[in-house]
Design a protein with these regions (language model features):
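Core catalytic alpha/beta fold that binds nucleotide/phospho-ligands
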Residues: 1-160
């Protein structure tokens, strides 16, 4: 069994003054990447995700956050150099989620289901025929939440 720590953060609760102070905790590469993000909400998510990740990993490893070195893998997923901690970040709507573990690769996904859209065409296109049939068999009022639950699980597996 895999044991992981999950952290939820609502980025909108962090005020502008705190965001300015937190920028100094980014590495030079992280700062450059953060600065290149043009959409303010995405910029806030990136900053807070990286700071949360650095602080929590540093706490577990007994080192300062700026001592952590990350490398980007061939598929763009960052990894921690020289340590066995695994992590994954996701965001949707007003929420940011971080998962940490030492037992192997993990993925996490959060979907708030805020977009009101017909989910059956998406399910027919992206899900296996058995999954699509399962979704069709549900009462119509349950289909949207079931769609997003399955979508999140699939996304988390792919991110691992």
């Amino acid at each position: 069994m895999l044991y992981a720590d999950l952290y939820l953060l609502k980025p909108a609760l962090i005020d502008a003054e705190q965001l300015i102070r937190l920028q100094s905790e980014l590495s030079p590469d992280e700062y450059r990447h953060w600065h290149e993000i043009r959409q303010p909400g995405r910029q806030r998510e990136y900053l807070l995700g990286r700071i949360l990740l650095r602080r929590l990993l540093a706490e577990r490893l007994g080192c300062p956050p700026d001592a952590l070195v990350f490398r980007t893998g061939e598929h763009g997923k960052p990894t921690l150099v020289s340590h066995d901690w695994q992590f994954n970040l996701s965001h949707s709507g007003d929420w940011l989620v971080l998962a940490l573990c030492q037992q192997g690769p993990l993925g996490v996904d959060v979907e708030m289901g805020l977009r009101q859209r017909p989910v059956l065409p998406l399910a027919q296109r992206f899900y296996a025929p058995e999954e699509y049939q399962w979704l069709l068999a549900l009462p119509s009022r349950a289909q949207t939440s079931a769609f997003y639950r399955l979508w999140s699980r699939k996304e988390a597996v792919l991110k691992a």
